[in-house]
Amino acid sequence: MKTLFFATTNENKINEVKNILDMPNLNLVVPKNFNIKETGTTFKENSLLKAKALFAILNKNQNVFGEDSGLCIEALNLEPGIYSKRYDTYKLCKKLSTNEKNQLILDLMKNEKNRKAYFICNISYISKDRQILNFEGIIKGEIALSLNDDKNYGFGYDSIFLTKNNKKLSDLTLEEKNKISHRGIAFSKFKKFLLKSLFNN
């Protein structure tokens, strides 16, 4: 059994990552009350900030990784971007529910013809011997015209993101989503690396 520490407290991300990695011999450990300010200007910088913070907390003696992801919309100058999680406070200086944040995006995109957008996921890994590696995944699509009120799956902006198959991410099961999503792509790359390195020793 190998142990790997994940610098997050986001339950939705944890569930997706466990499903994608699907490694019975991997003990994925999530720290309690882990909180760090995302001061980076890119997804890569933020994922590395998280990984470095957890690496330090664990006395630089464990394999760790951080992840940062978000939605980038062409017509909004690639916003919400790195502010995806906190776009409500960034844009309106107040907290909104998930549906309200989605509606905020739709309102900003009202009458906008260019609806191209993409989700990006960036992973930063730090090994016990201080090796730093980065993995990234992107899924391109469009912003829908309306909210998916009867969504069955997903979280965050999934209910307003249309894939190339004209399906919203929130219409897909977790398994279906993880085959094509930004997180699925990035963590599939990460899994290949882990199988070759961590589980080959």
Curated annotation (Swiss-Prot):
InterPro entries: dITP/XTP_pyrophosphatase, ITPase-like_fam, RdgB/HAM1. It holds the Pfam family Ham1p_like. It catalyses: XTP + H2O = XMP + diphosphate + H(+); dITP + H2O = dIMP + diphosphate + H(+); ITP + H2O = IMP + diphosphate + H(+). Its EC number is 3.6.1.66. It comes from the Bacteria. Mg(2+) binds at residue 68. GO terms for molecular function: dITP diphosphatase activity; ITP diphosphatase activity; metal ion binding; nucleotide binding; ribonucleoside triphosphate phosphatase activity; XTP diphosphatase activity. The active site is at residue 68. Keywords: Hydrolase, Magnesium, Metal-binding, Nucleotide metabolism, Nucleotide-binding. Binds 1 Mg(2+) ion per subunit. One of its GO terms (cellular component) is cytosol. Belongs to the HAM1 NTPase family. NCBIfam families: PRK14825.1, RdgB/HAM1 family non-canonical purine NTP pyrophosphatase. HAMAP family: Non_canon_purine_NTPase (MF_01405). This is dITP/XTP pyrophosphatase. The lineage of its organism: Bacteria, Pseudomonadati, Spirochaetota, Spirochaetia, Spirochaetales.
